[in-house]
């Protein structure tokens, strides 16, 4: 599982380049969430070619775009399956069971939630 906080086009470009250097043409089960106030289009344009499937998950930050709205954006950039999940836990489980390498990206809030989950601390609500 790869965790990367790419939340803007510059970081997404570096992520995509590094993914290709490390994994070649391998596709990712992409666990994704992004803040509504970020350049989501710019990020999606760069990371969409990495996706074998998308797993859109909610996040504790109120700034995160809802999974339904995110699905509409992702489908404009990608023709692979886009699956919306009710929880981070179900999204991670589905991604792990996909047969693809798992890539979690799009938001530092998302990475914080994932790291808290892995540490057994759960997810903490944030006002940001």
What is the predicted role of each segment?
Residues 1, 44-101:
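C-terminal helical cap/extension that packs against the catalytic core
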Residues 110-112:
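Short, active-site-adjacent cap segments at secondary-structure transitions
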Residues 107:
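Active-site-proximal loop/hinge segments that shape catalytic or ion-binding/gating pockets
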Residues 60-63, 124-128:
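Short, flexible loop segments at boundaries between secondary-structure elements
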Residues 1-53:
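Nucleotide phosphate-binding/pyrophosphate-handling subdomain across enzymes
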Residues 19, 23, 74, 118-122:
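Active-site catalytic pocket residues across diverse enzymes, especially alpha/beta-hydrolases
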């Amino acid at each position: 599982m790869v965790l990367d906080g790419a939340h803007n086009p510059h970081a997404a470009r570096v992520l995509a380049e590094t993914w290709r250097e490390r994994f070649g043409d391998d596709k990712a089960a992409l666990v994704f969430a992004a803040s509504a106030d970020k350049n989501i289009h710019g990020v999606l344009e760069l990371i969409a070619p990495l996706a074998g499937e998308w797993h859109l998950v909610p996040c504790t930050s109120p700034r995160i775009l809802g999974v339904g709205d995110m699905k509409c954006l992702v489908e404009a950039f990608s023709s692979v399956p886009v699956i919306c999940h009710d929880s981070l836990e179900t999204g991670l489980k589905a991604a792990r069971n996909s047969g693809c390498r798992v890539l979690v990206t799009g938001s530092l809030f998302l990475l914080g939630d994932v790291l808290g989950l892995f540490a057994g601390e759960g997810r903490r609500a944030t006002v940001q």
